[in-house]
Amino acid sequence: MIELSSEARAIVEGRHSDPFHYLGRHRENDRQVVRAYLPEASDVRVVDEHGGETTLTRIHDAGLFLGDLPNGAKRYRLRARFGADTVELEDPYRFPPILSDFDLYLLGEGTDQRLYDKLGAHPITMDGVGGTGFVVLAPNARAVAVVGDFNCWDRRRHPMRVRGNGYWELFIPGAQTGDRYKFAITDKSGSLLPLKSDPMAFAAEVRPNTASIVVDEAALPCPTPAAATINARRAPISIYEVHLGSWRRGDDNRWLSYRELADTLPRYASSLGFTHIELMPVNEHPFDGSWGYQPTGLYAPTSRFGSPDDFAHLVDACHREGLGVLLDWVPGHFPDDPHGLGHFDGTAFYEHANPLQGRHLDWDTLIYNYGRTEVVNFLVANALFWLDRYGLDGLRVDAVASMLYLDYSRAEGGWIPNKHGGRENLEAIAFLRRFNREVFAKFPHATTIAEESTAWPQVSRPIEFGGLGFGYKWNMGWMHDTLDYIGKDPIYRKHHHGQILFGLHYAFSENFILPLSHDEVVHEKRSILGRMPGDDWQRFANLRAYYAFMFGHPGKKLMFMGAEFGQEREWNHDHALDWHLLDQARHQGVQAVVRDLNALYRDVPALHELDCDPAGFEWIMANDADRSVFAWMRKGESGRARCLVIANFTPTVHRSYRVRVPFAGKWREALNTDSAHYGGSNVGNNGVVETLDGVIPELSLTLPPLAVIFLVPERA
């Protein structure tokens, strides 16, 4: 055996950061030599493009081979014997770099919006040879190798080379779509880390397995676009929030696939008049019980329900039904599973090293380091990826409050102030603004939505005016106050009248969405129906009235699956919704009123055009606490676009109830939640009411019990 150089020993010991410097073809004086590292091979020969063959000398028992390549040969292959098998291989170390110098410049600047075109695993052809290019960021690693189906998961076979700024790359001939792979990383001290999934993987194995899967994501079908105005401030936006794993299930409680869901979900949501479907996170995640909110694969649709192509089919099916598709997106934290982002290159790279900054106490997860350029680029590019590759129409950003505050859920002394001594996370603020700026610049018809549970100002206001730049914000205060109010016995509601009024004091401070989300039907909070007081008749009447109150209130709408037909029990992610309830008339009535409310909201401009504008709302009756009656006028952009909404939150019928209106003449009762069609007592105003004689136009109305009525002027 030849005495090994230090470089050769580094190859054999798996700690070489640039194996191309030693392996492959090299000129030494007047010779062309080939070095190959093929552990377990007993014999290796080099075959040039002319058919010439040279036997390489084994220079180390670990599988290091050396020999001459005939002068003038430009291409060659390796013919190796493994036991009784002889295979012919392309040498990965004869190919040029994957990343260009300009690529490395953009990556170093952290401004590459299409990071996903360069990092990860991409099937490509180099020098006429098909294979897969692998690129991963691990700046603090001593060595990185690719392991997978193509090399028997042998970390010795395919060491990568490091380029500028810690990007490691390798083209592996023959690696193809469908191959599983991971990265084998050696840290600075020489210790082997647990095998890591690719942070940029476009697909992964079904849990509990954690390997990444090679996918040609550039070949995904071009999505059918949604209408350009679907997210507009003046448009009706009614969102159906869905957890794909529990909306419906198949035989033996199995998950439905993306394609099975595509056959039913879009048509169902569209038939009820919803304008959007919001998907709880589909990013790959290891734990079902996280509902997707602890992702390890931000670029991969979960394989629980199928392939990336299958997911694209579902999005396309939604668009063909006229639905926008929103995705819950989690850039605030990630789990510390060994195969994931935590301690990725042997250091706290994606997360903060200090647990006072880097660990989320509520969820025992890791917090992204928004001060690191590469991490911010990774996250922003991920947002753009979903809008670009899958044609999604918007992103709902989860847990924004936990990102904005350094002391979120932390006791005194358990957090580190910012450079000004404050509690605001300045780096997270900068990240959110950059995220919104780049999303709207590249996808002007998309939207972004913040789940922000505090009074942080200007969340949905322009960045140039000091805002965070979101398109919309969930109105968590409205949700908490109104659910608390409607959950009280009607006899006590007069003492809590202000809970309804208070929301209108700030209803136009943001572009609000009124959310009845999944968070309100778990953890012993009960279902929305389960919160309603009284006997069965009153519970269902309360529910119908509450939904109508929401649709009459300023703000866009969101309803979690199951609420639309009065799901009785809390949501359980391990089981389908209780669809059998629709065999009962009272649940059919709830579904019918939701369908009609969506239609009314869409068809009456006054109910949606000025959802986010104070000009679109006027109190008509706000101080009738004794009777728990509220009346208000919704207004559209045109002069006669009006809709009168009156809510009676007691079981008492109020007759001859006088309400002032802006126009004399006939007003049509457009919807009455007490209609027998919905399971109500059918008290109402016989379809049309005419104003009384007098200087000021007034209506004399019958207010049905525990009900909301909508009236619009004839010829409006």
UniProtKB/Swiss-Prot annotation:
Q: What is its EC number?
A: 2.4.1.18
Q: Does this UniProt record's set of keywords contain Glycosyltransferase?
A: yes
Quote the function comment for this protein. Answer: Catalyzes the formation of the alpha-1,6-glucosidic linkages in glycogen by scission of a 1,4-alpha-linked oligosaccharide from growing alpha-1,4-glucan chains and the subsequent attachment of the oligosaccharide to the alpha-1,6 position.
One MF term in GO for this entry?
A: cation binding
**What pathway is this protein said to act in by its record?**
Glycan biosynthesis; glycogen biosynthesis
Question: Transmembrane stretches, by residue range?
Answer: none
Residue stretches in coiled coil: none
| Gene Ontology cellular component terms for the protein in this record | cytosol
User: What's this protein's name?
Assistant: 1,4-alpha-glucan branching enzyme GlgB
Could you tell me the keywords of this UniProt record? Carbohydrate metabolism, Glycogen biosynthesis, Glycogen metabolism, Glycosyltransferase, Transferase
